[in-house]
């Protein structure tokens, strides 16, 4: 078994090998979200060649920045945080949907099975909220194969895409993947 957030980290790094303009990061949770591109450095004032961004604890700004990057063009932006914090991102996600921007939102720890963080980190209504935003694709993969398929769809569709990922290990099912 493997948590889909771990599968997501593997998939993101494989995508980065083939798509050098994949650019993004996490609010302050890159190790937990598994969003660090291992063969790239952090983008900074002194290093403009990095593809990893440390946005800091400001989910709305992170999401709005990714919208701006998508509007500028040339890069494939993604950003990540715990799913419960998607509430802070909602106005910017809604704007990306209105503009049809190809931003990928990686939202981990997607259930009440999040462990020691307690009830403040247990998303209940967030998945329904994301699914209700017109023009936004929302994926909740059941395993690693569906996680890879969700990223492929997000990159192919060219619209805002939220990918909800588990913290807990999930079995790999025989009949999942692209067709699911």
How would you name each of these model-derived features?
Residues 170-180:
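Aromatic-enriched
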